[in-house]
Design a protein with these regions (language model features):
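Auxiliary alpha/beta "docking" domains used to position bulky ligands
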Residues: 1-127
Length: 127
């Protein structure tokens, strides 16, 4: 029998997640953190390619968060909320560093050994 986290990670793998973490943050709030690959070419160098890539990744992230949110609710958690690629409610970078997704770069971007800064972060919080 799969545990909830195993099931979540299986869904994440299906949705092309490259980095994932499960952590307890404050009190009884848990956090599942995900990173999806997205080329970090600057916008002005190839605006249309970058925009297309970001929108494609955003679609994958939304599908991933939706499927995983259902699994978490099915496991009895009542309060579940998500933060996607375009979330304006909070900065996920400190959580990404805490989850060992990478280290802070000089310009405030998280850099991973394998992927560099070529990823976008999303999260699900639940209690």
């Amino acid at each position: 029998m799969l545990t909830m986290i195993d099931e979540v990670y299986k869904i994440a793998d299906k949705n092309e997640v490259i980095l994932k973490a499960n952590m307890k943050i404050s009190g009884n709030v848990n956090c599942l953190l995900f990173a999806n690959y997205c080329d970090s070419t600057v916008f002005y160098k190839d605006f249309f390619k970058v925009s297309k890539d970001i929108l494609r990744v955003n679609k994958m992230v939304r599908r991933n968060l939706k499927e995983i949110k259902k699994v978490i609710k099915d496991n009895g958690y009542k309060k579940v909320w998500t933060r996607g690629v375009f979330s304006v409610y909070g900065d996920l970078r400190p959580l990404a560093v805490e989850a060992n997704f990478g280290e802070w770069g000089d310009n405030g971007i998280i850099k991973n050994e394998k992927y560099g800064s070529d990823f976008l972060i999303s999260a699900i919080f639940y209690k």
